[in-house]
Amino acid sequence: MRHALLEGQRDIVLLLARVLLMILFVLAGWGKLTGFEGTVGYMTSLGAPVPTLAAAVAVIMEFVVGILLILGFYTRPLALLFALFVLGTALIGHPFWSMVDPERSANMTQFLKNLSIIGGLLALAVSGPGRFSLDKG
């Protein structure tokens, strides 16, 4: 009785979770891809040692891997890889500890948002993609 609300809904909930977790990244990755020069400029502003490579990695992770996770393709390993990517973007892109307000507050929120997303990705890595996926098992 205590789980009746989601009884028999595991697979559809996992599909919804994959879409909701990744839609932000797929859209951001598309923006980075279609505005690649601007993405390289942003990576340069962050101090990335090889900004063009960093921009390409961001596009591949956000757009390509994001779509693969929505489709449920190699879900468990890609969810773990994506969690590491999100941790890296949190540490590099939102170093709130070295800022002052109001920039500090805004970046702390983004940093914590990234940690929350990592939690969802870890849950996905443990649970797997569900039946509505390209993975076989």
PLM regions: where:
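Extended, low-polarity transmembrane helix blocks
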Residues: 1-34, 44, 52-60, 64-137
